[in-house]
From Swiss-Prot:
Protein name according to UniProt: Xylose isomerase
Subunit relationships: Homotetramer.
S-S pairs: none
Keyword Iron-sulfur: no
GO BP, one annotated term: D-xylose metabolic process
Subcellular location: Cytoplasm
Active site residues according to the UniProt entry: H54, D57
Residue numbers binding Mg(2+) 1: E181, E217, D245, D287
Catalytic activity: alpha-D-xylose = alpha-D-xylulofuranose
A single MF term (Gene Ontology): xylose isomerase activity
Length: 388
């Protein structure tokens, strides 16, 4: 298998990823700003499928209408020249100080109304550029102290906002769905809808739940100490994995945004195995930050590394699934039984079946080994390249 990516691999990057200048709370930028046109061209050369953007990534905040149209025109020309696509777009509702207390859940009503109009304006552009997914990350929706935010009222306002956006998209006839991106904390002390589970539960309360799914990010779920592949599996099970953000994270700490494959490599292996075996057809979107130690050559090396690592893990996961010893080990661990309904014969037959309870030998069942260690070591052998 070649580790050289092609557009058919559906790898995408946000303008804000490779465009991150290295500025953090403790230090200034270490790299110059990148022109979005340059970003499109370089990512196309690396084999990417598309780019994504916040409104302010493409059009500097406060631009006049004339300036806005000029930025969009140049961007379109770059897309046309390279064949790159825009599968997803989103709104920056976190950088400007006006959003210091949030956007859709800000205590100030006028800020909430402004946030909705800002979002709607970029939804129009997203649809114009062919995006099929609109991501919503509520990075400022939260609080640092208990009395500062009435969470129930805030969730009412969050629901109101998404219902209005769904109404707008429907009224305009846009072929666009929303993907809510959870995160437990940072920049706020506590963020609303902190995990995939919270977001999935929230979506079921919306007026048009079919329009909404999730955009889980590797590092965000791991910041909460959760198993990312398990969260993705539940999103797939619910039919709600509308988009995914791939990066790397090393445990429960600040949001590291490492290149994909860095950090928890075992989790990355199981994630790729899941996405590929489940037939996920959406973009493989990298939301990472090249370390501020890197110059621009390092930025592009980091982006290339994201794609290369995914392709290597894809190859290793496929070899794992095709290995006859692995298939035997899966049967020994009774994974085939887990795929069978527990009571396909119905409740009446279950209650009448003495072997299910009265005659069930609990001691014999308790003594059965599960053979998980053998299965896991086979996975490790494939991950580490010890098996072909």
């Amino acid at each position: 298998m070649s580790y050289q990516p092609t557009p058919e691999d559906r790898f995408t990057f946000g303008l804000w990823t490779v465009g991150w200048q290295g500025r953090d709370p403790f230090g200034d930028a270490t790299r110059r700003a990148l022109d979005p046109v340059e970003t499109v061209q370089r990512l196309a050369e690396l084999g990417a499928h598309g780019v994504t953007f916040h409104d302010d990534d493409l059009i500097p905040f406060g631009s006049s209408d004339t300036e806005r149209e000029s930025h969009i025109k140049r961007f379109r020309q770059a897309l046309d020249a390279t064949g790159m696509t825009v599968p997803m777009a989103t709104t920056n509702l976190f950088t400007h100080p006006v959003f210091k207390d949030g956007a859709f859940t800000a205590n100030d009503r006028d800020v909430r109304r402004y946030a909705l109009r800002k979002t709607i304006r970029n939804i129009d552009l997203a649809a114009e550029l062919g995006a099929k997914t609109y991501v919503a990350w509520g990075g400022r929706e939260g609080a640092e102290s208990g009395a500062a935010k009435d969470v129930r009222s805030a969730l009412d306002r969050m629901k109101e906002a998404f219902d209005l956006l769904g109404e707008y998209v429907t009224s305009q006839g846009y072929d666009l769905r929303f993907a809510i991106e959870p995160k437990p904390n940072e920049p706020r002390g506590d963020i609303l809808l902190p995990t995939v589970g919270h977001a999935l539960a929230f979506i079921e309360r919306l007026e048009r739940p079919e329009l909404y799914g999730v955009n889980p990010e590797v590092g965000h779920e791991q910041m909460a100490g959760l198993n990312f592949p398990h969260g993705i599996a539940q999103a797939l099970w619910a039919g709600k994995l509308f988009h995914i953000d791939l990066n790397g994270q090393s445990g429960i700490k600040y949001d590291q945004d490492l290149r994909f494959g860095a950090g928890d490599l075992r989790s990355a292996f199981w994630l790729v195995d899941l996405l590929e075996s489940a037939g996920y057809e959406g973009p493989r979107h990298f939301d990472f930050k090249p370390p501020r130690t890197e110059d621009l050559d390092g930025v592009w090396a980091s982006a290339a590394g994201c794609m290369r690592n995914y392709l290597i893990l894809k190859e290793r996961a496929a070899a794992f699934r095709a290995d006859p010893e692995v298939q035997a080990a899966l049967r020994a661990s009774r994974l085939d039984q887990l795929a069978q309904p527990t009571a396909a014969d119905g409740l009446e037959d279950l209650l009448a079946d003495r072997a299910a309870f009265e005659d069930f030998d609990v001691e014999a069942a308790a003594a059965r080994g599960m053979a998980f260690e053998r299965l896991d070591q086979l996975a490790m052998d494939h991950l580490l390249g010890a098996r072909g």
